[in-house]
UniProtKB/Swiss-Prot annotation:
Protein name, as recorded: Cyclic pyranopterin monophosphate synthase
UniProt record similarity statement: Belongs to the MoaC family.
HAMAP family according to UniProt: MoaC_B
UniProt entry keywords in alphabetical sequence: Lyase, Molybdenum cofactor biosynthesis
Pfam families per record: MoaC
An annotated GO BP: Mo-molybdopterin cofactor biosynthetic process
Top-level taxon: Bacteria
Assembly: Homohexamer; trimer of dimers.
Active site, per annotation: 125
Enzyme Commission number(s) from the entry: 4.6.1.17
InterPro entries named in the record: MoaC, MoaC_bact/euk, MoaC_sf, MoCo_biosynth_MoaA/MoaC, Mopterin_CF_biosynth-C_dom
Residues annotated to bind substrate: 73-75, 110-111
Role according to the record: Catalyzes the conversion of (8S)-3',8-cyclo-7,8-dihydroguanosine 5'-triphosphate to cyclic pyranopterin monophosphate (cPMP).
Length: 161
């Protein structure tokens, strides 16, 4: 059953009033593939626009806080922790991991996914002048803790088709 639809099939924000406040956490990732020369420029600090990782990290943090403004049926949340980690992955990619936490009545999966996605888009924006062929891939939820549905770990779950 899709929880965002009412009995007539209309989009609706889920009522979480009676849900218990519990600790909730989610971790998401995104990967940006690029030319090795582009990655080298980022890692060496030689990008003319400045520190790509620092700007992407701040963009991801800001995005997590704005998720309910971007995704219509997401609840506005008082996140208690947002972390965005960026690192070179091989010689042609940046792997972004974003985690969000709160004590609340609804999960933070969308906030973590939004943080990872916007950090990836920020890397693309900052580097597009030197590498228009970059590819953003593997945006996914890695882990979710808390709430009624329990603990989810991506590599231990069946992939939806």
């Amino acid at each position: 059953m899709l929880t965002h639809l009412d009995s007539q099939g209309r989009a609706n924000m889920v009522d979480v009033t009676d849900k218990a406040v519990t600790s909730r956490e989610a971790v998401a990732e995104a990967v940006v593939r690029m030319l090795p020369t582009t990655l080298q420029m980022i890692v060496s600090g030689g990008h003319p626009k400045g520190d790509v990782f620092a700007v992407a990290r701040i963009a991801g943090i800001q995005a997590a806080k704005k998720t309910s403004d971007l995704i219509p049926l997401c609840h506005p949340l008082m996140l208690t922790s947002i972390k965005v980690h960026l690192a070179a992955d091989g010689d042609d990619a940046v792997r972004i991991t974003a985690s969000c936490k709160l004590a609340g009545q609804t999960g933070v999966e969308m906030e973590a996914l939004t943080a990872a996605s916007i950090a990836a888009l920020t890397i693309y924006d900052m580097c597009k002048a030197v590498d228009r062929g970059m590819v953003i891939e593997s945006v996914r939820l890695l882990e979710k803790l808390g709430g009624k549905s329990g603990h989810f770990i991506a590599d231990q779950a069946q992939v939806s088709s």
